[in-house]
Amino acid sequence: MRKLFLVFLIALGFCVHSAIAFGATAAPDVATEAAEAWLALADKGDAQATWHQAAGAFKTGVEQKDWEKTLPKARQPLGEVISRKLQSSETTTTLPGVADGEYVIFRFQTSFTNKKSASEALLMQKEADGVWRTVGYFIQ
Protein backbone atom coordinates (compact mmCIF):
# COMPACT_ATOMS: atom_id res chain seq x y z
CA MET A 1 0.00 0.00 0.00
CA ARG A 2 2.81 2.41 0.89
CA LYS A 3 4.62 1.71 -2.42
CA LEU A 4 1.40 2.28 -4.34
CA PHE A 5 0.83 5.59 -2.57
CA LEU A 6 4.44 6.65 -3.22
CA VAL A 7 4.03 5.86 -6.92
CA PHE A 8 0.81 7.89 -6.87
CA LEU A 9 2.63 10.85 -5.29
CA ILE A 10 5.44 10.72 -7.85
CA ALA A 11 2.98 10.50 -10.73
CA LEU A 12 0.99 13.32 -9.21
CA GLY A 13 4.11 15.46 -9.05
CA PHE A 14 4.54 15.06 -12.80
CA CYS A 15 0.86 15.86 -13.29
CA VAL A 16 1.12 19.02 -11.21
CA HIS A 17 4.09 20.18 -13.26
CA SER A 18 2.31 19.42 -16.54
CA ALA A 19 -0.89 21.19 -15.55
CA ILE A 20 1.00 24.32 -14.55
CA ALA A 21 3.10 24.21 -17.70
CA PHE A 22 -0.04 24.26 -19.85
CA GLY A 23 -1.39 27.34 -18.09
CA ALA A 24 -4.61 26.31 -16.40
CA THR A 25 -6.86 28.99 -14.90
CA ALA A 26 -6.82 30.45 -11.38
CA ALA A 27 -8.51 28.69 -8.45
CA PRO A 28 -11.94 29.56 -7.08
CA ASP A 29 -11.94 31.31 -3.69
CA VAL A 30 -13.70 28.43 -1.95
CA ALA A 31 -10.93 26.04 -3.02
CA THR A 32 -8.29 28.47 -1.75
CA GLU A 33 -10.07 28.75 1.60
CA ALA A 34 -10.29 24.95 1.87
CA ALA A 35 -6.58 24.61 1.08
CA GLU A 36 -5.61 27.21 3.68
CA ALA A 37 -7.84 25.57 6.31
CA TRP A 38 -6.27 22.17 5.63
CA LEU A 39 -2.76 23.60 5.86
CA ALA A 40 -3.67 25.29 9.17
CA LEU A 41 -4.54 21.85 10.57
CA ALA A 42 -1.24 20.46 9.28
CA ASP A 43 0.58 23.42 10.83
CA LYS A 44 -0.93 22.52 14.21
CA GLY A 45 0.25 18.93 13.76
CA ASP A 46 -3.32 17.63 13.68
CA ALA A 47 -2.76 14.64 11.38
CA GLN A 48 -6.06 13.06 12.40
CA ALA A 49 -8.05 16.13 11.33
CA THR A 50 -6.12 16.49 8.06
CA TRP A 51 -6.93 12.87 7.20
CA HIS A 52 -10.61 13.35 8.03
CA GLN A 53 -10.74 16.51 5.88
CA ALA A 54 -9.02 14.80 2.93
CA ALA A 55 -10.68 13.57 -0.25
CA GLY A 56 -11.83 10.01 -0.68
CA ALA A 57 -8.99 9.32 -3.13
CA PHE A 58 -6.48 10.40 -0.48
CA LYS A 59 -8.08 8.15 2.14
CA THR A 60 -8.06 5.23 -0.30
CA GLY A 61 -4.35 5.79 -0.93
CA VAL A 62 -3.21 5.98 2.68
CA GLU A 63 -4.70 4.54 5.84
CA GLN A 64 -5.38 6.93 8.70
CA LYS A 65 -2.92 5.24 11.07
CA ASP A 66 -0.17 5.52 8.44
CA TRP A 67 -0.94 9.18 7.75
CA GLU A 68 -0.87 9.95 11.47
CA LYS A 69 2.75 8.71 11.47
CA THR A 70 3.77 10.19 8.11
CA LEU A 71 2.67 13.81 8.53
CA PRO A 72 4.52 14.41 11.83
CA LYS A 73 7.68 12.77 10.43
CA ALA A 74 7.58 15.14 7.47
CA ARG A 75 6.63 18.32 9.31
CA GLN A 76 8.18 18.21 12.81
CA PRO A 77 11.82 18.47 11.63
CA LEU A 78 10.90 21.67 9.76
CA GLY A 79 9.69 23.45 12.88
CA GLU A 80 6.97 26.08 13.07
CA VAL A 81 5.68 27.96 10.04
CA ILE A 82 7.12 31.47 9.92
CA SER A 83 5.46 32.53 6.68
CA ARG A 84 3.62 31.05 3.73
CA LYS A 85 2.94 32.77 0.43
CA LEU A 86 0.75 31.44 -2.35
CA GLN A 87 2.92 31.24 -5.46
CA SER A 88 0.34 29.86 -7.89
CA SER A 89 -3.02 28.18 -8.16
CA GLU A 90 -4.08 26.37 -11.28
CA THR A 91 -7.32 24.60 -12.12
CA THR A 92 -7.59 21.56 -14.33
CA THR A 93 -10.10 18.85 -15.09
CA THR A 94 -7.65 16.15 -16.13
CA LEU A 95 -4.57 14.74 -14.48
CA PRO A 96 -2.80 11.56 -15.59
CA GLY A 97 -3.48 8.64 -13.29
CA VAL A 98 -6.60 10.05 -11.62
CA ALA A 99 -10.25 10.29 -12.62
CA ASP A 100 -11.36 13.39 -14.48
CA GLY A 101 -12.88 16.00 -12.23
CA GLU A 102 -12.33 19.48 -10.85
CA TYR A 103 -8.85 19.95 -9.39
CA VAL A 104 -6.78 22.86 -8.15
CA ILE A 105 -3.03 22.71 -7.76
CA PHE A 106 -1.66 25.14 -5.19
CA ARG A 107 2.03 25.97 -4.79
CA PHE A 108 3.21 27.81 -1.70
CA GLN A 109 6.60 29.23 -0.76
CA THR A 110 6.92 28.51 2.94
CA SER A 111 9.47 29.43 5.57
CA PHE A 112 9.83 27.21 8.64
CA THR A 113 12.01 27.79 11.70
CA ASN A 114 14.36 24.97 10.63
CA LYS A 115 14.03 25.36 6.84
CA LYS A 116 13.98 28.89 5.57
CA SER A 117 12.75 28.12 2.07
CA ALA A 118 10.46 25.23 1.23
CA SER A 119 7.96 24.58 -1.53
CA GLU A 120 4.62 23.08 -0.60
CA ALA A 121 2.21 21.72 -3.19
CA LEU A 122 -1.36 20.93 -2.32
CA LEU A 123 -3.74 19.22 -4.73
CA MET A 124 -7.42 19.81 -4.05
CA GLN A 125 -10.39 18.03 -5.62
CA LYS A 126 -14.02 19.12 -5.72
CA GLU A 127 -15.90 16.02 -4.64
CA ALA A 128 -19.45 14.98 -5.57
CA ASP A 129 -20.88 16.85 -2.55
CA GLY A 130 -19.38 20.10 -3.87
CA VAL A 131 -16.73 20.35 -1.14
CA TRP A 132 -13.06 20.93 -2.00
CA ARG A 133 -10.81 18.40 -0.25
CA THR A 134 -7.12 17.55 -0.27
CA VAL A 135 -5.94 14.77 -2.58
CA GLY A 136 -2.19 15.27 -2.20
CA TYR A 137 0.36 17.20 -0.14
CA PHE A 138 4.06 17.51 -0.93
CA ILE A 139 6.97 19.40 0.65
CA GLN A 140 10.31 20.04 -1.05
Please provide the spans of the model-predicted regions.
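Short, low-complexity N-terminal intrinsically disordered segments enriched in polar/charged residues
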Residues: 4, 18-46
